[in-house]
Amino acid sequence: MCVIVTAVPGAMPEPADLLAMSEANPDGGGVSWWDGKRLRVFKNVDGLKVVGYIYSHWDRLKYAPCLIHFRLATHGAVAPENCHPFRTERGYVAHNGIAYDFEDGPYESDTKNMVRAWIDSGYDNRILSGQGSVALITPHGCLKWLEGEPVLLERGVMVSNTYWQL
């Protein structure tokens, strides 16, 4: 199971938590943040490189709204094109869970199929219903949970699950 993290400006998961998330979900990851002017993104098939990027840019990222994702591949190869978050006109989106309605489609990844269907529907959120957790960072840095019930990890930090803590 993957994990999604949203962190408001001034909040960030503890470094040990980020490391545990990456180790439990080792098939890639990414972080998207708003730098005050536009959205930025860093993704890599090695989740530890994502953790390293976050650590090396800690001062900047801690004070920006961030959407972080660590992937456990269930559908689709461990490959750069399957690392979340995915870019849309609405911002960057990340998914946690299996999108059962989208296991078959043009992509190996159920998430990529779901995101494509969401875009093609004109961003009708009913497409996302029942497909797991989905979070978005908008082009102006607003963090939104579109589906699922996030868990408060600590002040200002929400996660899609805590399975990585086991």
Where are these regions (language model features)?
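Short, basic and Ser/Thr-rich N-terminal targeting/leader segments
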Residues: 25-28, 61, 79, 128-130
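Short, glycine-/Ser/Thr-/acidic-enriched flexible segments
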Residues: 10-11, 72-74, 98-99, 141
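Acidic loop->beta-strand submotif enriched in PP2C/PPM serine/threonine phosphatases
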Residues: 73-91, 127
